[in-house]
Amino acid sequence: HYCSRRQRQMCIRDRSTIKRDGKIHEMKFENGEKKSELEVIGEVGSRNTGTIIKFKPDPSYFESEKVEVKKLKHLLKAKAVLCPNLKISFTNENNKKDKEVWEYPSGLESYLAEEIKDQEFLLKDPIISSNANDDNSIDFAINWIMGNVKNLLNESYVNLIPTAQGGSHLNGFKAGLLESLKEFCEFRNLLPKGLKLSADDVLQNAAFIISSKLKDPQFAGQTKERLDLSLIHISEPTRRPKI
């Protein structure tokens, strides 16, 4: 468990406490520099393990040093979704009643069902897919909402990082989805002559979540909101047989 040097530089001070092998270890940092060596400060039971990181953001790097609770909750929830059976708890120390716990045994499927509940679906069961090669893996869940859309989920992640601006993994997903449905319709003569499906046709009212895990992802910008690495070789063909 660690924070990168860049992350530490963005904090006025932070402290890491690690419980391992029956001992409590602590190390302190300030303005990106080590303030104390790793030292043992106590003892615990051998099964009592974990890491606590306390930090204070440096306002010179941010518009405000206050944490956006709504955004933080979404990020924590996403981590629970993308790691099945991981239990994440949130407590707001400024408002003791503001507590939430997230746990999704079925991962993407559980999350998709929760986010688009109380709506009519095209498919009784969503399409769930999981594929991997030696270096990369990609999972997705998708269903279509019928009638009036109350809440439409369109989310993508790379290595548990939300990619709000999409990128090649999302483009590959959309391309694979379009080609799958075009091939299905053409093979069964379901479309009138001269009519072709477009991406807008197949993505309208589509609710989906995509999770990619890559060995060497390449992001655009420091916020990592868009993936630049071409993933068409894994994200497009692996979807077609499933869909």
Model-derived segments and spans:
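Short, conserved micro-motifs enriched in small and acidic residues
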Residues: R5, G167-N171, S230
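Ser/Thr-centric signal marking residues that sit
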Residues: T49-T51, T163, T223, T238
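GHKL/Histidine-kinase-like ATPase module
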Residues: V40, K70, K77-K79, N85-K224
